[in-house]
Amino acid sequence: FGVPQLRKRLIFIATKDDSNMPEFIFPSPTHADRYNTVWDAIGDLPLIGAGESADRYKTKPISEFQRIMRSKRSKLYNHKAPNHPQETVEKIRSTVPGEPMYEKYRQRIRLAWDMPSPTQLAGGIRPQFQFGHPEVPRGLTVRERARIQSFPDDYIFTGGVVQGRVQTGNAVPPLLAMAIGSSIDKMLTEFYQKVKLVENM
């Protein structure tokens, strides 16, 4: 559904047996052949170093996904990079994008521009750092994580980097929620049209 992330989700939609509700039809995938990549998601955000921040865009949107995420905003929120020891910076710098940064923790990779992100987690080995940025040797900002989850830039996360990581990692991606919500709306519309038809007979 356009979320630039490889993540499996288990979604339950339930109705009462005696409600005469139409069968729920799960929405068909929209981006199976042309998925959004990390570049599509965050390629327009300012390239900042570890411990740095930025509150203004420096370029125009490059992809349709970025255009949707910005929605004509000029101010940028939650784009503060976690600070790392120099040893960590060098570890990220020496890692090829798409490859794990640590042999022991192979789920901690440096993201690649041309692929979707793996699953964004709320927890992890360290509170500030799960994936490395594809180009800059640091972990992701809350805004970059939010983009990868398909949160628009006008959604502002409160708290620090750790709280932002928990909020983004635990969330259902808005684009997924919108697709499922649209299917629920169709099901309910069909149901109430039938109810109204029966009442008018």
Residue positions per predicted region:
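C-terminal target-recognition/interaction regions appended to catalytic cores
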Residues: T59-M201
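Class I S-adenosyl-L-methionine
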Residues: F1-M101
